């Protein structure tokens, strides 16, 4: 008895392959974090191994991205070693019609925002379930917080109408700790009518390092979809 392929995985694989095909030889590539981006990193490594690509350099946004890139033979550099990033490819937890994003399900949004903002072209790879009419519809806003400021930041976001919850680890006791050594609050808002304003307001709270709202950064959204049971990719630009 054969198991039917997972439709979500099929969509992610299709969009990962499409994104990896956008990378050209000699490019400096921002390597995002997450399940879809992990597949894209694998596709990049396969293109390198086949000789379809040469002399690319990756800028990882997390420990996970770094490990995967090394596993698939992608040379890595830091921001100190490059003058620019040609393109960044990253996932998202939500995408609204204006191409604003919520990111940070992998607790890597601080580094992701740095790398994605520096890229000449920021490509977002998602499956169709991540498209929403308004940010905050299905996913809370991740907020990275200095550990000593956790309590006052929770009070501040509550005054803004948010419902903060400390993200706890899986397969470990205690909270999730970011690559920077900080904690993450997942903040649920009833509505986010102005993502740009909320992004600024959250970042102005003392003790907040960065939040997962990304405004005016994404240039292209590649959406994995199923049509008649077959995976396809739709571009929003």
From Swiss-Prot:
One of its GO terms (molecular function) is ribose-5-phosphate isomerase activity. Pathway: Carbohydrate degradation; pentose phosphate pathway; D-ribose 5-phosphate from D-ribulose 5-phosphate (non-oxidative stage): step 1/1. It comes from the Bacteria. Its EC number is 5.3.1.6. HAMAP family: Rib_5P_isom_A. Homodimer. Substrate binds at residues 33-36, 90-93, 103-106, 130. GO terms for biological process: D-ribose metabolic process; pentose-phosphate shunt, non-oxidative branch. Keywords: Isomerase. One of its GO terms (cellular component) is cytosol. SUPFAM superfamilies: D-ribose-5-phosphate isomerase (RpiA), lid domain, NagB/RpiA/CoA transferase-like. The active site is at 112 (proton acceptor). This is Ribose-5-phosphate isomerase A. Catalyzes the reversible conversion of ribose-5-phosphate to ribulose 5-phosphate. It comes from Cyanothece sp. (strain PCC 7425 / ATCC 29141). Belongs to the ribose 5-phosphate isomerase family. It catalyses: aldehydo-D-ribose 5-phosphate = D-ribulose 5-phosphate.
């Amino acid at each position: 008895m054969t198991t039917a392929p997972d439709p979500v995985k099929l969509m992610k694989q299709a969009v990962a392959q499409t994104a990896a095909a956008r990378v050209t030889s000699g490019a400096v590539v921002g390597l995002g974090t997450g399940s879809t981006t992990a597949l894209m990193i694998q596709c990049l490594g396969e293109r390198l191994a086949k000789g379809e690509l040469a002399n690319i350099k990756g800028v990882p946004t997390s420990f996970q991205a770094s490990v995967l890139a090394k596993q698939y033979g992608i040379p890595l550099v830091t921001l100190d070693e490059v003058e620019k990033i040609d393109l960044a490819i990253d996932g998202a937890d939500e995408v609204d019609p204006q191409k604003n994003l919520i990111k940070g399900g992998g607790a890597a949004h601080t580094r992701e925002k740095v790398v994605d903002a520096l890229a000449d072209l920021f490509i977002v790879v998602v499956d169709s379930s991540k498209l929403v009419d308004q940010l905050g519809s299905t996913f809370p806003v991740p907020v990275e917080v200095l550990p000593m400021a956790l309590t006052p930041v929770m009070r501040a976001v509550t005054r803004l109408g948010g419902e903060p919850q400390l993200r706890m680890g899986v397969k470990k006791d205690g909270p999730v700790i970011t690559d920077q050594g900080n904690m993450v609050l997942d903040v649920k808002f009833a509505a986010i009518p102005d993502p740009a304003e909320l992004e600024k307001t959250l970042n102005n709270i003392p003790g907040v390092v960065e939040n997962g709202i990304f405004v005016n950064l994404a240039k292209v959204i590649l959406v994995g979809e199923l049509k008649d049971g077959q995976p396809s990719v739709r571009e929003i630009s």
